[in-house]
Amino acid sequence: MTVSIDGVSKYFSKQTRTVQVLENINFQLEKGDFVTVIGPSGCGKSTLLKIIAGLDGEFEGEIIIDGERITKPSKKQGFIFQEHRLFPWLTVEENIAADLSLKDKYVKDKVKEWVEIVRLDGFEKSYPKEISGGMSQRVAIARALLRDPNVLLLDEPFGALDAFTRSHLQEVLLNIWEQKKTTMIFVTHDIDEAIYLSNRIVIMSAKPGKIHKVIENNLPYPRSKTSESFQEIRKKVLQQFERGGLIQTSI
């Protein structure tokens, strides 16, 4: 299974003028890749993710997943937003099942499996208002992965969480990735998060958004953010931000 982003460009119309948001984005992922996308605010990271998800069909170029051209949402793509977007009137297990019936034994068993994977045992009958923000985001992760998507797209899913919760969810996500080998594309503003999670870091520049540099990250798992090798990768990423004039903008 491959994911191909081929020549993707995107324009927005603003009153009497047209603004280019993305310019000729090209990269490929193989099954089991974990790619993080990082860059200045406004460089089109989230727009690119929505295009890959099939949520935005007005663009130039092609998105090919497992040989199929993507023009709309499908089971091939799971998507996790910056906020969890749970239904407040549904329990944890009902939110994970979403439009599938828990009366179906297969669905019930799959939901139970994902409850265990994201470490929500004992909270199946709880409602969103009764659990923390971090737990709610774990529900969102389980919901997105229940249908076994070819690729999981994550748009800064931990950005609004405190440092301890974010660190915990990074471990949960890595555990899922190691177990399921789901291909992942993860948008973040956090350089350390990008290095900690992925095996490839795509650095984007802005106005219009384009790929500035792709850095391979071959650090073995589990990773330590205080290790010398981790800091060497961090230095490489920061050097690319400086060379591209990206460090002047908040990342």
Curated annotation (Swiss-Prot):
Segment forming the signal sequence: none
ABC transporter domain: residues covered: 3-231
UniProt function note: Part of the ABC transporter complex SsuABC involved in aliphatic sulfonates import. Responsible for energy coupling to the transport system.
One term under GO cellular component: plasma membrane
Catalytic reaction annotation: ATP + H2O + aliphatic sulfonate-[sulfonate-binding protein]Side 1 = ADP + phosphate + aliphatic sulfonateSide 2 + [sulfonate-binding protein]Side 1
Alphabetized UniProt keyword annotations: ATP-binding, Cell membrane, Membrane, Nucleotide-binding, Translocase, Transport
Name this protein carries in UniProt: Aliphatic sulfonates import ATP-binding protein SsuB
Subcellular location: Cell membrane
Gene: ssuB
EC number(s) per entry: 7.6.2.14
Stated family: Belongs to the ABC transporter superfamily. Aliphatic sulfonates importer (TC 3.A.1.17.2) family.
